[in-house]
Amino acid sequence: MPKLKTKSAVKKRFKLTATGKVIASQAGKKHFMRRRTKAQIRNLRGTTILCPKDGYNIKKYFLPYGIN
């Protein structure tokens, strides 16, 4: 049986930690930044850990070798 392919869109947007959690960048930072306060913009920097259910769905359906 051939190897399963990873969805390349998911590969670009999410990463797995060593403990198996899924990391994604914060949403809401592409446009309409003028209406946001400086504190909101600052809090949108960096990455966030997805909730366990969303992380499970990402690993199960889009990262075929993400679930051990």
From Swiss-Prot:
Q: Give GO terms for biological process.
A: translation
**Keyword annotations from UniProtKB, A to Z:** Ribonucleoprotein, Ribosomal protein
* SUPFAM superfamilies for this protein: L35p-like
- Ribosomal protein among the record's keywords? yes
Q: Which Pfam families match?
A: Ribosomal_L35p
What cellular component GO annotations does this protein have? cytosolic large ribosomal subunit
Q: Which domain of life does the UniProt lineage start with?
A: Bacteria
Checking NCBIfam families in the record gives: rpmI_bact
The entry sums up its family as follows:
Belongs to the bacterial ribosomal protein bL35 family.
Q: Which GO terms describe its molecular function?
A: structural constituent of ribosome
Q: List the Gene3D superfamilies.
A: 4.10.410.60
Name this polypeptide is given: Large ribosomal subunit protein bL35
